[in-house]
Design a protein with these regions (language model features):
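N-terminal acidic leader/helix
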Residues: 2-34
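Acidic, low-complexity intrinsically disordered segments
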Residues: 26, 31-71
Length: 71
């Protein structure tokens, strides 16, 4: 699985990432509560996607771009 995340919007409290995998999707993160909302999971499992977002985006201080590769 290869997912590329790209920050597409950011406000004081919310970040939206677009993702590219076999089908594109979008996620939203509340910076204050760290709540993850899957706007469109594409073809990825939503629960696995939330885990990936927590580990790779939230814990890495919301990078502008990130590539996740498993395997």
């Amino acid at each position: 699985m290869m997912i590329r995340f790209r920050k597409s919007q950011e406000t004081d409290s919310i970040i939206i990432y677009e993702m590219a995998s076999t089908s594109p999707g979008r996620i939203q993160i509340n910076k204050k509560t760290k709540e993850i909302q899957i706007l469109d999971s594409g073809d990825e499992d939503p629960e696995e996607l939330k885990f990936i977002v927590k580990v790779y985006l939230i814990e890495n201080d919301y990078p502008d771009q990130y590539t996740y590769a498993e395997g």
